[in-house]
Amino acid sequence: MAQSLSRLWTHLIFSTKNRFPFLSDKTIRMDMHRYLATILREQDCETLIVNGVEDHVHALFALSRTNAIASVVKEIKRTSSSWVKERSPKLAKFYWQGGYGAFSVSHSNLEDVIRYIENHEEHHKRMTFQDEYRAFLKAMVLPMMSVTFGIRWNADSLKA
């Protein structure tokens, strides 16, 4: 095959440092989501949706065939952090957390994930970010998370 083809749908989740609610202003939060989508497109990642709440963000996009997920995440965090600090003196201490979660999504599940991200604010009236992330870990069965986050996972540590 003379060409390279790739279509890796990715559900990316990351939070503000220490889950501080930096994005509590709805206007800034919505602007941040639009800006993150722009950065993803600039990284050649077809972006379907970006949404979130005061302390974390979800994005659903097709990972570019020429970029690694770590490079894409590093760029969107770096660029958006600088952008938001320039927007408001109140956000001078804004930072993203060091880690992230990136999960592959089957094409057949795209609509469900889009709906989940669209209704994210409503979802968090029933579930905390920590509980949500535990559910992702449990569903995805990711024992390698101990390497990424330095936490020893077992069945008890994934209980809500």
List PLM regions with ranges.
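Basic nucleic-acid-binding interfaces
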Residues: 1-159
